[in-house]
């Protein structure tokens, strides 16, 4: 069995990208070519992506939009609090993490951004229900702060408000960006269209749990966070058409991957074909998982000991990912949300846990 230490690596801190590059497509792209063994590592720039994809392939994007989900405020007693909205659950309600010297009880009033009051409702572990005095999304957009990842050391600014969103973000609800999509700009999307590459979207609202490291040595004991996704019928139809013409389904980001594979696994378990789905998923993809939909994956470089590093290791092979990450560190690639990208191809047979 694989253990947590199998997914650890030492990253020089200066390789953690703190800001976005001036141009989205200026990022580097490490292509992991599995047509040979061992896999060949090809250093590219992201603008070269169209040369790596064939006409008739399908790119699947996550169109979630990052909320300005972080608030600073205070209790009626004057005690300082920090609130991170995890999920909007209704027009006037949301689930949130609350940092405070003492957890607020139900019925407590909290003042946020020195602008409005929310009331604490029932606890839904590990979150608190918050009741807003006006539509949540309006207040979040007007008064909230962009929740940059914990490893980005500057406060969010106007540049982040543009660059920590994809150009196609349209469904508000995430508290972290689907970062593989940050490399695409409109000219690149139009270039892909002109080449005959198909595009489709789904929605998965990325939760703060995406940054949580695994803390148990036996990774099978890890409790995965849950996220909501919407896989529309139009995407199901495009996947079927792509399969019929022999094209590849290419997930743009691990969030697109998780939604696609969650829906496909549920369909398999129910003995039916892939169908339009709106559901929660806590799918935890580790080596040994049998991929059902995704053939290739565009993804950024992930944190040590993270569930996403385990996912890409399951997809491309543990040793392949180790070699790719060693190469990326030697070649000074930029890591994490504002960093560079990889293009991976699925390992043909699932890797047995511990193999």
Curated annotation (Swiss-Prot):
GO terms in the biological process aspect are: queuosine biosynthetic process; tRNA wobble guanine modification
* Domain of life, per lineage: Bacteria
InterPro entries membership: QueA, QueA_dom1, QueA_dom2, QueA_sf
Record-given protein name: S-adenosylmethionine:tRNA ribosyltransferase-isomerase
Query: Family assignment?
Result: Belongs to the QueA family.
What the entry lists under PANTHER family is as follows: S-ADENOSYLMETHIONINE:TRNA RIBOSYLTRANSFERASE-ISOMERASE
Instruction: Tell me the classification of the organism that encodes this protein.
Output: Bacteria, Pseudomonadati, Pseudomonadota, Betaproteobacteria, Burkholderiales
Name the EC number(s).
Answer: 2.4.99.17
Q: From the UniProt record, list the reaction(s) this protein catalyses.
A: 7-aminomethyl-7-carbaguanosine(34) in tRNA + S-adenosyl-L-methionine = epoxyqueuosine(34) in tRNA + adenine + L-methionine + 2 H(+)
The record's subcellular location field reads: Cytoplasm
Any Pfam family from its record, for instance, is Queuosine_synth
**Presence of the UniProt keyword Cytoplasm in the record:** yes
Q: In which pathway does it act?
A: tRNA modification; tRNA-queuosine biosynthesis
Ordered alphabetically, the record's keywords are: Cytoplasm, Queuosine biosynthesis, S-adenosyl-L-methionine, Transferase
Describe the protein's quaternary organization and the partners it interacts with. Monomer.
Q: What does this protein do?
A: Transfers and isomerizes the ribose moiety from AdoMet to the 7-aminomethyl group of 7-deazaguanine (preQ1-tRNA) to give epoxyqueuosine (oQ-tRNA).
Q: A GO molecular function for this record?
A: S-adenosylmethionine:tRNA ribosyltransferase-isomerase activity
Residues crossing the lipid bilayer are none
**For this UniProt entry, what's an example GO CC term?**
cytoplasm
